[in-house]
């Protein structure tokens, strides 16, 4: 469509949207080709279990989203189709993985360092005798 003459089969107002849609489909196609060029087993061997779960969830979400778009292009309301429940289920698992990731990133308490920090931060008054002894030593020199 890009660079072609405007087709009279559809309203001129949507030409820009159709061009953007075509470009998006081309980008998705390129990403899928890149992703499919590496075998799944080869990819997963390089990742830790949490990263593997993320890859699986993103793949499942992408496929279901593409099916959602397909249903919409066929005139089927995807909101009334079981694909909606599947997308919601995947979203729940994505949130669980995000919670696990956030827990791993959360700071951990180093009790020794915390007690040293608190101990050094507290003010301790000097004994009265210590200051007098220090002053006497200075005056004799």
Curated annotation (Swiss-Prot):
GO molecular function, one term: RNA binding
Cross-link type Glycyl lysine isopeptide (Lys-Gly) (interchain with G-Cter in SUMO2), residue numbers: 119, 126, 132
Key words, A-Z: Apoptosis, Cytoplasm, DNA-binding, Isopeptide bond, Nucleus, Phosphoprotein, Repressor, RNA-binding, rRNA processing, Transcription, Transcription regulation, Ubl conjugation
Region called Required for transcriptional repression, residue ranges: 1-100
Protein modification: Phosphorylated by PRKDC.
InterPro entries: Exosome-assoc_fac/DNA_repair (IPR011082), Sas10/Utp3/C1D (IPR007146)
Region (Interaction with NR1D1) location: 50-100
Cysteine disulfide links: none
Pfam families: Sas10_Utp3 (PF04000)
Transmembrane stretches, start-end: none
Keyword flag Cytoplasm: yes
Principal subcellular localisation of the protein: nucleus
Chain intervals for the UniProt region annotation (Interaction with NCOR1 and NCOR2): 100-141
Keyword Ribonucleoprotein: no
Record's subunit section: Monomer and homodimer. Interacts with NR1D1, THRA, THRB, NCOR1 and NCOR2. Associates with the RNA exosome complex. Interacts with EXOSC10; the interaction probably mediates the association with the nuclear form of the RNA exosome. The homodimeric form interacts with TSNAX following gamma-radiation. Interacts with RAC3.
Protein task: Plays a role in the recruitment of the exosome to pre-rRNA to mediate the 3'-5' end processing of the 5.8S rRNA. Forms a multi-subunit complex with MPHOSPH6 and EXOSC10 and this complex along with MTR4 is required for the 3'-5' end processing of the 5.8S rRNA. Can activate PRKDC not only in the presence of linear DNA but also in the presence of supercoiled DNA. Can induce apoptosis in a p53/TP53 dependent manner. May regulate the TRAX/TSN complex formation. Potentiates transcriptional repression by NR1D1 and THRB.
Protein family per UniProt: Belongs to the C1D family.
Protein name in the entry: Nuclear nucleic acid-binding protein C1D
Taxonomic lineage of the native organism: Eukaryota, Metazoa, Chordata, Craniata, Vertebrata
